[in-house]
């Protein structure tokens, strides 16, 4: 049975991809975890989750998403997230986990400053939910599936092809975010407070929480 190993701050210790190409595509199912769920954790990578079958009760920070087959969720870097069965039904999914630098390249790049960092640091954007309710969701979904296929086939130049498709996916998302979206920067205090709350909830998951 699978289990997510974390450190004291709930940071996942698993390496996603390699130093040369920090991207990993993996197939999972909730029933494959010891508790029938993947519990609260975070990592510096962005994670895209595509539900293949069943359903997942997906939580990101304070947000809850009721995901079904075909739904996609892009979780921001460094956000706390967890996934649970809903109505005791299993959920099968594929995850694309990658470091943001695949999109922007060098640290001093204008791509990082202009198109990536503002998203990563926006506390009001813990995740973007793709439920096919808008026309651009179909385009986004096609990019996700293309990345999965490229990774699985690993043909010549696949790293370049994945990087290019990932950049197109990122552009598709950015240009369709609401124009009036509030911008709230992350702070260490906010992140630590959130992790303390989630840590308490996780350790008391099987117990009745006393309200005082």
Label each residue range with its predicted role:
Residues 1-72, 78-79, 87, 111-114, ...:
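Generic protein-terminus/edge-of-domain signal
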Residues 126-137, 151-212:
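Short, Lys/Arg-enriched, Trp-marked, Pro/Gly-tolerant hinge/linker segments that flank
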Residues 57, 82, 204:
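Detector for the N-terminal beta1/A-loop initiation region of ABC nucleotide-binding domains
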Residues 78-103, 108-111:
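Ligand-binding loop in jelly-roll beta-barrel domains
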Residues 113-141:
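Aromatic/histidine-rich interaction motifs
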